[in-house]
Amino acid sequence: MGTISLCIGVCAFEGANTSTSFYKLVYTAILSYSIQDLLPEQDMKDLCQKVTLTRHRSWGLDNLHLVKDWRTVNEGKGQKEYCNRLTQCSSTKSKIFQCIECGRNFSWRSILTEHKRIHTGEKPYKCEECGKVFNRCSNLTKHKRIHTGEKPYKCDECGKVFNWWSQLTNHKKIHTGEKPYKCDECDKVFNWWSQLTSHKKIHSGEKPYPCEECGKAFTQFSNLTQHKRIHTGEKPYKCKECCKAFNKFSNLTQHKRIHTGEKPYKCEECGNVFNECSHLTRHRRIHTGEKPYKCEECGKAFTQFASLTRHKRIHTGEKPYQCEECGKTFNRCSHLSSHKRIHTGEKPYKCEECGRTFTQFSNLTQHKRIHTGEKPYKCKECGKAFNKFSSLTQHRRIHTGVKPYKCEECGKVFKQCSHLTSHKRIHTGEKPYKCKECGKAFYQSSILSKHKRIHTEEKPYKCEECGKAFNQFSSLTRHKRIHTGEKRYKCKECGKGFYQSSIHSKYKRIYTGEEPDKCKKCGSL
């Protein structure tokens, strides 16, 4: 008879009193097997004394079915014996349908048909809503739920609903803590098989999905799909609230939390909440002290991979972010974004207390501490507190004596980078800070600020003792010594003290015999 798929037509009994379960079992077992595989030749003769071939229409199938007059069945070879044979055969499921293209075997012809579409690229199931095509009907059914918003699968534990059964199954593992998939290489466990598969590629180094545009390779096909959107500029995920679009669905999900204020990720250690899981993961390292990302060049370790990537640019000198306006390059994207505001004049961050605006959010945060008086950065050495971390870093160098910034021109060292930058202008002669009033130029911004007070006659520094005001802070400091009696500048020859360095310098000339400087205009001393 060959391997034609036949089924005993138990639904066409003539007066047979046979259970529904038996008919289901016969249909299930026989559907993918030849009759000879199931029943011995003698049993076939005993069973099929009266047989007719008919097309079975009630199930909507095109298979030919044997219809038996059950009145002739030998009582000694009844349902039980054949049920046992059929159950045994159904459980073994010989894979008799083979793919000619790749040699893979399947138990069902329908599965083979679906499989063949991988090789042919055929996608016969089309979404009427958006035109997207699929190689499986089930995938189209799942896809349609995106348009309808249908989420038929609900979690009994927390009430969360899902489009797909597989999503619910995976979600349940959050509640149970089940991680059934273990890596043989490092014993790490995972909730999902796909996570384990992706993880294994870390050990093998396999990246089977290359980008045809730039050659970059990926461990997962989904990562390649997302990456391609960099080249195409495609942003298929749009926020209904503000219309902002994203190239990743996860980015849209995270963005939505700005509108909802949702922060679903909570730190068990301190109770701090976050709107992204990755932010919680990074935060936890504060408690654990873990720094898993280490620089091979200098050994410095970081809590975040992004921080390591940025740090590496110090060694390589790489500055991949360029300003289109002036051509200046930066090693961080955030630095470029801040820099661009110099050209646009944009200051999007406003202080609600005084109305002052800033180009950077970090500058606003620091500024707010002027109003609150908050000084969160404390020196362990002397207890002095600061409102900026950079100020604490600079202060620490007083105790350590470290001066990490060296001038390549003259070898002079400085505690602060800004001091080195100002110093370099002595060698270059650069004076970038110009007075609009008189045109005089200066190499430091602070010197220009002091100079401007000559024109404005502003004297912002007032003595609390006598009320006298000064245009420079250093002048007020010197003046205060009159009230305190402090004379910090002493003559080494006679021990006489002075409260000003300039007076001390003039006095020293008595012993040195040095002529005092004459005035260039009138010639007087």
Curated annotation (Swiss-Prot):
Q: Name one GO cellular component term.
A: nucleus
Disulfide bonds, paired cysteine numbers? none
GO annotation (BP), single = regulation of DNA-templated transcription
Stated name of the protein: Zinc finger protein 678
Alphabetical UniProt keywords: DNA-binding, Metal-binding, Nucleus, Repeat, Transcription, Transcription regulation, Zinc, Zinc-finger
Kindly list the ranges of residues that form C2H2-type zinc fingers according to the record: 97-119, 125-147, 153-175, 181-203, 209-231, 237-259, 265-287, 293-315, 321-343, 349-371, 377-399, 405-427, 433-455, 461-483, 489-511
- UniProt similarity note: Belongs to the krueppel C2H2-type zinc-finger protein family.
Q: Does the keyword Protease apply?
A: no
Q: Which GO terms describe its molecular function?
A: DNA-binding transcription factor activity, RNA polymerase II-specific; RNA polymerase II cis-regulatory region sequence-specific DNA binding; zinc ion binding
- InterPro entries noted in UniProt: Znf_C2H2_sf (IPR036236), Znf_C2H2_type (IPR013087)
Q: Primary place of residence?
A: nucleus
Question: So what does this one do?
Answer: May be involved in transcriptional regulation.
